[in-house]
Each structure stands twice: as structure tokens, then as C-alpha cells.
Amino acid sequence: MIETDIRELNEKIQRESQFVDLINLEMNKVIVGQKQMTERLLIGLLANGHILLEGVPGLAKTLAIKSLSSAISADFSRIQFTPDLLPADLIGTLIYSQKKEEFVVRRGPIFANFVLADEINRSPAKVQSALLEAMQEHQVTIGEETFKLPDPFLVMATQNPIEQEGTYPLPEAQVDRFMLKVIINYPKKEEEKLILRQNITNSASKINAVVRPEDILRAREVCREVYLDEKIENYITDIVFASRFPSDYRLKRFANMISYGGSPRASINLALASKAYAFIKRRGYVIPEDVRAVALDVLRHRIGLTYEAEAENITTEEIINEILNTIEVP
């Protein structure tokens, strides 16, 4: 790509990405800390990918997506997943209208721009698969009719750490449909003091709508234009291939630790998330640091560990970090 094209693209992105600061400003009114979580929400929104958040209750996961939807003046719905939830509770159902003497469609909470699927691993597989099908197809079928879901459509699913009781682990094939899996940690001590003050004095500010859904759709188009050099493409595929065939990449010690590596969807999502990250950083091209910044969240749920790895307390994060340290940076 020639220099003038890059310069023009940079200028275009500078113009189109101004809303990022506005959204961050609004979200910072109510969210203390958790910078990575809010940044990953924006990446998912721009790259048209869904997000899986893992963390104990009370870490502002619900507040974050609710604040984001308010800042974009979009529809928000929250679905609490429970063991007795049915697919119809999620997508909707046909109910008989005595007045019309016919069946009419009652739409479920999935019909919103931002859907918070809270504690997704507390409901059985049939409900999980109904949600994941809606995520993949951007449409649902009720009775014999198919309905398109609104655009933009972003699902943020939360799950409790698997060690907790009463949870159903998500199957690997379904987890793979989430672009990012983000681990949410406790806030720092100073941040927690701010949270404390904000909540006991009722000083939290109101979120203002600063962006329209149409602006997000336009930004997505621009995001796709971010330049990805062939060297960066090779870097991305090397990272994903190293998760499948570690011995070919001087990572022999992990050969018996990985049961399966990243799928082609991992390569696609790593490229799209890197483009969105570059967009947020006001750049018209992807650099290796962008790939490294999102690699952990894109790959951590796409690598399966063997019993040997679990016996030695090896984590997917360790493997990904070792891959990033081993693969030559272009």
C-alpha cells in the first residue's frame, strides 16, 4: 500500500474514531478501573464479534454493557440464565390471541442491540445453543417465520469460573463462536475506594447518548479498511499454527500439553480484533503490537489442554505467552 493511501486512511480513521473518546468519557462516569473490559467491549462492537466475560459476580460486567448501550442510544436487554430457562424464553414464542383468533409472535429479549447473557453456564445446553445460533446467524426462527435481529447486535455473555457449583461448561465448538474471552479481575485498592465512595454517596453520573447506532455501523465499514500487511498476516497465521503444531515452532515442551489448537476462525478473529484495536488507537494499519495486545483474549478459549497440562498446572495463558515470545515479530 503506497504512503499517500496510508495517510488518507489515517485521516479517515482520525475522523471516524472520534466517538471512541466520547464513549470512554461516558463510561468512565460510572465504571471505575476495568479499562481492559471497556476496551474489549469496543473491539467486539467494531469488529462485529461477541464477547465472553469470566469473573466472579460484582465486577461491573452488567453495568459496563448497560452503560455502553446507553452511550449509543441502543436497545439493551439482560437475560438471567437459570437451569429452568427454555429456548422460547430467549428467542420468543407463538401465543394464541383470542381477540384475533390466531397465533401471534411474541418476541423474546434476544431482540435488542445489546444483549447481556448473564451466567450463561448456569443453563442447559439447549438454551446455550439457541443463543449461540442467534449470535452466528443474526436471525431466529419462531414457528415457521424467520426474523432478523437488529443491527448492531452484540452479545456479551458472562460466566462464573467453572469451579463454582451448578455450572454447565460451554462445549468447545460453541465457545469458539465468541470473538473474545476476557478474564475480569478484582479492582485495585484505590479503585475500590472510589467505587465505595461513588456508591455510598450516590454520586454516580447519568450516561448521555453520544453516538447513534448508524455511526457504529459506519465505523465498522471503516474498521474493515484498516490495512493488514502480508507480513502481519503471516505473523497471525504463525501464532495460530503454533497453537496447533507447537513442535514445528520450537515449542516441543507443549506438544503433549495441547489437545487442540486454534481453528481458522481464530486467525480470522485475531485479524479482525487487531484491526479494531488499531482503529481505537487511531491508526490506519495494523502493527505487531496490535496483534499481541488482543492475542490472549482471542486465543485463550480456543486452545484445549491435555491431562498432562492440567497435572502440571500449565494454563492456556502460559502457552499463548510462550508462543508470542517465540514467534519472530515482523
Q: Where does each model-flagged region fall?
A:
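Walker B catalytic acidic pair
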Residues: 55, 118-119, 130
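Walker A/P-loop
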Residues: 45-82
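Pre-Walker A (pre-P-loop) alpha-helix and adjacent loop at the N terminus of AAA/AAA+ ATPase modules
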Residues: 13-59
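Conserved alpha-helical scaffold flanking the Walker A/P-loop in AAA+ ATPase domains
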Residues: 40-43, 96-116, 145
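Canonical AAA+ ATPase core
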Residues: 97-101, 119, 123-127, 135-226, ...
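Conserved beta-strand position immediately N-terminal to the Walker
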Residues: 51, 115, 153
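C-terminal engagement/docking regions of AAA+ P-loop ATPases
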Residues: 1-8, 13-14, 248-330
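Conserved C-terminal "switch" segment of AAA+ ATPases
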Residues: 10-17, 30, 167, 181-253, ...
